[in-house]
């Protein structure tokens, strides 16, 4: 067997290699490093020095013994060490020549197997993702992250180190890593959710397209402004429009409703209901402008307002005197009074109605009630009250109640009344 020699590096270099940041792994970093370590089998003695120098330049670490006994070597700046073999016989280096080739072959075969399995599973994952979702391109970056080529060198280095000592564990770890895209896909949203998510916008568009008949707030605002301008230009009042709608379409609207529509003060639902009616009225009014139509006649009737009645001071004084005598005259009294004052019966009736409303506004109700109570005699308030003993004979409340106020039922009385009612219902 060819001899293996080692060069003795300076003590400072050994300190840097062992304690100052050297590698602390007990195996080569990768399969490529394992192949480079073949320099240890020298067939010519004149290559020993160069091979030993190259050995110290490799990133691979010394043997496990060097890792465990680094602190016990006591290497310092003044120590004169000969060689590694002189200080510590390394069984790892002695047996390296015997098992190096089988280990390299196992590493190569395991690496090929792992790469084949990972590529096969990655291809299956991409096919499944492409069949499951129309947006498989969105998942490609996630799947590619677990591809063999996308892994970091450090992960590959740890995988190779594990294969040297535990090939079965390394294959299982690689298999688990290759299956990771499937778990990532399961953790994500399902294809149905993706399809529903991306089709949601289309569904909303379809729904909104089916509800095109419902106007928006902007449409209502624009129509209200246009309607008001056209109505004023045509010469119709808001009361005319409300009366015309009632005559034409059967829905009578007041002047206040039309005013609130133009001012956008109605609810959105009522605005939507009123808009088509006003639009039809506006179209008919535009088409029949200049010719006397039913709308014009209705508008003319609406514009016919009665002239405000003016009553002379003497007549008003007579009505006031009669009002103090009788605030609510009968029909015969109204007729006789109208004849005596030479007024229409309807004018007299309306005047009395307005006068009564004015009296209510001028007189607070509490004052009127207080005056009435003050005017009553003291005994009248008590004897004019409610006497329950007149109509409570035979009742559970007793027959000798002398209270002049409505009886207040206590819980005991309510319970007894309920028991009596239950007994009567049972019989």
UniProtKB/Swiss-Prot annotation:
Region (Disordered), start-end ranges: 39-77, 196-217, 288-309, 390-427
Q: Which cysteines are joined by disulfide bonds?
A: none
- POU-specific domain residues: 212-286
The reply to whether Transcription regulation figures as a keyword in the UniProt entry is yes
Which Pfam families does this one have?
Answer: Homeodomain, Pou
Main location per the UniProt record: nucleus
Q: Which PROSITE patterns match?
A: HOMEOBOX_1, HOMEOBOX_2, POU_1, POU_2, POU_3
* Gly residues compositional bias, start-end: 67-77
Gene Ontology MF terms in the entry: DNA-binding transcription activator activity, RNA polymerase II-specific; DNA-binding transcription factor activity, RNA polymerase II-specific; RNA polymerase II cis-regulatory region sequence-specific DNA binding; RNA polymerase II transcription regulatory region sequence-specific DNA binding
For bias type Low complexity, the affected ranges are 49-66
**Cross-referenced InterPro entries:** HD, Homeobox_CS, Homeodomain-like_sf, Lambda_DNA-bd_dom_sf, POU, POU_dom, POU_domain_TF, TF_POU_3
For this record, an example GO cellular component is: nucleus
- What tissue expression does the UniProt record report for this protein? Coexpressed with acj6 in overlapping subsets of neurons in the embryonic epidermis and central nervous system. First detected in the precursor of the tracheal pits and the stomodeal invagination and later in the peripheral nervous system.
Q: Name one GO biological process term.
A: regulation of dendrite morphogenesis
Keywords attached to this entry: Activator, DNA-binding, Homeobox, Nucleus, Transcription, Transcription regulation
Q: Does the keyword DNA-binding apply?
A: yes
DNA-binding region, residue intervals: 304-363
Where is the protein found, in the record's own terms? Nucleus
The UniProt function text for this chain reads:
Binds to a DNA sequence element required for the expression of the dopa decarboxylase gene (Ddc) in specific dopaminergic neurons. Could also play an early role in specific ectodermal cells, and a subsequent role in the embryonic nervous system.
Protein family membership: Belongs to the POU transcription factor family. Class-3 subfamily.
**What is this protein's name?**
POU domain protein CF1A
**Species, as recorded:** Drosophila melanogaster (Fruit fly)
Q: Which gene encodes it?
A: vvl
């Amino acid at each position: 067997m060819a001899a293996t020699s080692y060069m003795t590096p300076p003590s400072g270099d050994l300190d840097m290699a062992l304690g100052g940041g050297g590698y602390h792994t007990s195996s080569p970093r990768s399969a490529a490093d394992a192949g480079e370590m073949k320099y240890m089998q020298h067939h010519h003695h004149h290559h020993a020095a160069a091979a030993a120098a190259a050995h110290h330049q490799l990133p691979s670490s010394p043997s496990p013994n060097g890792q465990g006994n680094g602190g016990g070597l006591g290497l310092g700046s003044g120590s004169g060490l000969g060689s590694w073999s002189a200080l510590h016989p390394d069984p790892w280096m002695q047996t390296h020549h015997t098992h190096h080739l089988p280990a390299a072959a196992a590493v190569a075969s395991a690496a090929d197997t792992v790469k084949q399995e990972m590529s096969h599973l990655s291809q299956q994952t991409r096919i499944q993702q492409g069949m499951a979702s129309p947006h498989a391109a969105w998942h490609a970056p996630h799947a590619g992250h677990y591809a063999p080529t996308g892994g970091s060198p450090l992960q590959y280095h740890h995988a190779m180190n594990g294969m040297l000592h535990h090939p079965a564990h390394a294959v299982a770890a690689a298999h688990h890593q290759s299956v990771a895209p499937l778990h990532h896909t399961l953790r994500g949203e399902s294809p149905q959710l993706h399809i529903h998510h991306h089709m949601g916008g289309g569904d909303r568009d379809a729904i909104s397209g089916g509800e095109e008949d419902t106007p928006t707030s902007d449409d209502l605002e624009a129509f209200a402004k246009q309607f008001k301008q056209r109505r004023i230009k045509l010469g119709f009042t808001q009361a005319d429009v409300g009366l015309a709608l009632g005559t034409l379409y059967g829905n009578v609207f007041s002047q206040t409703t039309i005013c609130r529509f133009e001012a956008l003060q109605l609810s959105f639902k009522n605005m939507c209901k009123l808009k088509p009616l006003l639009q039809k009225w506006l179209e008919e009014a535009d088409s029949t402008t200049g010719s006397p139509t039913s709308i014009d006649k209705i508008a003319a009737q609406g514009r016919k307002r009665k002239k405000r009645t003016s009553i002379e001071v003497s007549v008003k004084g007579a009505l006031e005197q009669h009002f103090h005598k009788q605030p609510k005259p009968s029909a015969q009294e109204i007729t006789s009074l109208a004849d005596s004052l030479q007024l229409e019966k309807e004018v007299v009736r309306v005047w009395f109605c307005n006068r009564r409303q004015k009296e209510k506004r001028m007189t607070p109700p509490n004052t009127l009630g207080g005056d009435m109570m003050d005017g009553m005699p003291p005994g009248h308030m008590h004897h004019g009250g409610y006497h329950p003993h007149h109509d409570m004979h035979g009742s559970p409340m007793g027959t000798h109640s002398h209270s002049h106020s409505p009886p207040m039922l206590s819980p005991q009385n309510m319970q007894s009344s309920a028991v009596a009612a239950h007994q009567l219902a049972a019989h």
